[in-house]
Amino acid sequence: MKKIQISPSILSADFSQLGNEIKRLEEGGADMIHVDVMDGHFVPNLTIGPPVIKALRKQCSIKFDVHLMISPVHKYIEAYADAGADIITIHPEATDNLEESISKIKSLNKKVGVSLNPETKIDLINNYLEKIDLVLIMSVNPGFGGQKFMPEVLDKVKQLKEIKSKRNMNFDIEIDGGINFDNCQSAIEAGANILVSGTTVFESNNGDIKKNINLLKLK
């Protein structure tokens, strides 16, 4: 079994102190930083773009797990790669040609993630799993932080785990949306090995990031 990793979402950080917040996450033992990029078109919210990611990249050395909720996504992939993304995750619905977009990310020497919204079926990406490094299962409808976890998506996580085992694959299974101390164990048991968490990491236990990360890892 892969080791459990925590990818805190900076959507829940203090945006007036983003540089310091990134440093706090690194010092607190975060395995990577989850950066939610929203365009107000593919999802109903606006967040940050390449210049902010480029500035933040200078503040820490751990991986940037960049989740692109933008459409059309293909023409922006290179800009986020250049800004410092290590993993670039896209939605199948946001590109005209998923295979081309996957190849584009790989050509830039970045890890490829593909995200599935709660209603999106695994069948949509089944033929691409050999080329994917990470599958991100959304456990809320994307667009805003702080939403309630949708337990029904754990069936999808279990299905992916079975596919991985049957086809002897090695992609990561990441879960994002409403992850907290009450549901992290069920997410891990279902097969997720990367947990995205924002509010829980930044706000629980008086903001003790190290403690919160360890609790999410069931330590």
Indicate where each model-derived feature is located:
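Conserved N-terminal beta1-alpha1 strand-loop-helix module at the mouth
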Residues: 1-89, 93-97, 104-112, 124-132, ...
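A structural signal for the hydrophobic beta-strands that form the central parallel beta-sheet
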Residues: 6, 175, 196-197
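Generic enzyme active-site microenvironment
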Residues: 34, 174-175
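Internal catalytic-core helix/loop-beta-alpha segment
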Residues: 111-115, 119
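Short glycine-rich anion-binding loops that position phosphate/pyrophosphate groups of nucleotides
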Residues: 140-142
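Acidic, divalent-metal-coordinating active-site segment for phosphoryl/phosphodiester hydrolysis
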Residues: 178-190
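Acidic, Mg2+-coordinating phosphoryl-transfer loop and its flanking beta/alpha structural elements
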Residues: 192-197, 201-203
